[in-house]
């Protein structure tokens, strides 16, 4: 809730920076988080968390994971030498059984970051995300991914414009919408979606977090 994450060096971790919301906890609904002026690099340490644990699903070589949070702004960060992915925007546990848990990230804005050297040794040993990424990317690993998982109503009728992922980055960055829901339902007809224009839009800067 209402956090500024800035001026950090994240290195030699499994995942450099994690912005998570988890089910079955007394405090949920993470929102209004700014991640800026950080350096996240060489986060290629093997994941030693117990399998079955949410954190245990994070692949080695990840710069930043945004999971099941809303209103997150990521800007002016440097991502480099992460062997799987620089930024992953993904849904949380879809089968948690927690009626109060909303697993889908929404209103995420990513802009004015720098990226270099990614995806050169993706971790396919932990969790499903990296395995799915490698299969769908087919050798062309991206800097930023969105898993493309939406509530069924939005998958059919469209996502509200104020909840869409906004990606305002250099034209040289590589992006991939995994479109994972349709991949699992209609894999024969699935093709990688790398079109960044679907995610262009105006940045609405989040307010600075005030000290208590």
Where are these regions (language model features)?
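Right-handed parallel beta-helix
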Residues: 1-15, 29-44, 71-81, 103-117
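Short, solvent-exposed loop/turn segments at secondary-structure junctions
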Residues: 88, 95-97
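Acidic, glycine- and Ser/Thr-rich low-complexity intrinsically disordered tracts
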Residues: 95, 103-212
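Short glycine/acidic-rich loop motifs that flank beta-strands on beta-rich extracellular proteins
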Residues: 1-3, 10, 14-21, 44-51, ...
